[in-house]
Amino acid sequence: MAVFTSISEAELSAWLSDYSLGDLQNLQGIASGIENTNYFVTTANGRFVLTIFEKLTAQELPFYLNFMAHLARHGIPCPAPVANRRNELLGELKGKPACIATRLSGAATLTPNAAQCAAMGAMLAQLHIAGQSFTHTMPNPRGSIWRATTAPRVRAYLDGEQAALLDSEVEFQESTDFAALPQGVIHADLFRDNVLLE
């Protein structure tokens, strides 16, 4: 269930008064997802998705929201965060960071065919091209620091052969000079439930 933080229509209506989206018409929790609370929101001005962030902090989120806005401005079909009346993409709801973004059409496909996979690959290439002009950066949240703290915790659950494979990979990762590789923002969360197809 992806509604970890419950919100009433009255609470959301009050929050939406800081936006130019019109009156709230419908609020519906979204059951899919594993990390954030999500609602479908319909207002007088359109259909949106409200996300209440359960793990990421208000300090971490501007990078992601600004990147989404950048991609949307460059024609990538992704949710576009909506700014409030103070031109801020990130708000706070029930003491947690929250944003509202445009709702895309389409549906997730659990068994995509070859043509759909090819279309997703082409869109991902367009995302990477559009991302080249995004000037903000952030450290890789699954980079060397994360690997160094996570590998020992995972290792405890592995048999000898799996542990040796993990150790070998961690050693390889530590010996690789990633600074010599091309740099850029990637999706890093691409899976079937996260792609909407017409």
Model-derived segments and spans:
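Regulatory N- and C-terminal appendages and interdomain linkers associated
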Residues: M1-L27, H70
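An alpha-helical support segment within catalytic cores of ATP-dependent transferases
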Residues: I7-D18, T135-H136, R147-A188, E198
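Short, conserved clusters of charged catalytic residues that mark active-site
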Residues: G22, F63, S168
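Proline- and acidic/polar-enriched loop/turn elements at helix boundaries
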Residues: Q28, A83-N84, P139
